[in-house]
Amino acid sequence: RKDYKNVQFTVKLKNETLRIPRKKVTVKGGTYFLWPFNQSLSGVLLKYSTTQPICSLAEGNNNTYFFFEDDLIPGEYFIDNKDIQDLKVKNGTFRKEKNGYFIDQLTPGKECTIEATKNNGAIVRFVTLTEEESDYIWKGTIKGKEFVVISNSSLIYDNDKITLIDERPSTEAW
């Protein structure tokens, strides 16, 4: 399969045109992906991302959205700055622009986070996992409360507890 060089998409919206990604990339043959754009996530408008969505976790007024960086295509986010009081980024860089925040130079992993504090105090987080970590994400509900676990162990849960099953004497969950 051949690679596709200098790939960039142009999305024309009512009031603006998005170029996704900002810099043209090479897409390896056989690669497939879904990049979200113009999507409201708990009241924060994600204008686009070159990361793939996995799942979300609601914790009271706060919400966390999990994404992963796929097939060596650099992850980037463009988030509307409307209704955002503060933005913090770990393991990446951001700059405020006229229409929002541009986040790039991500180092994917469990600690790669974007935290947007909305004007009402609610927090919306974006976690950018590696492709491998995305294979080990588990989501469920215990006693009416959602949970997300990242572990390469097998996982069983019921209404009371989570059990990790692994041949190793100790295992890790995040």
What are these regions (language model features)?
Residues K2-W174:
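Non-catalytic C-terminal accessory domains or segments of carbohydrate-active enzymes
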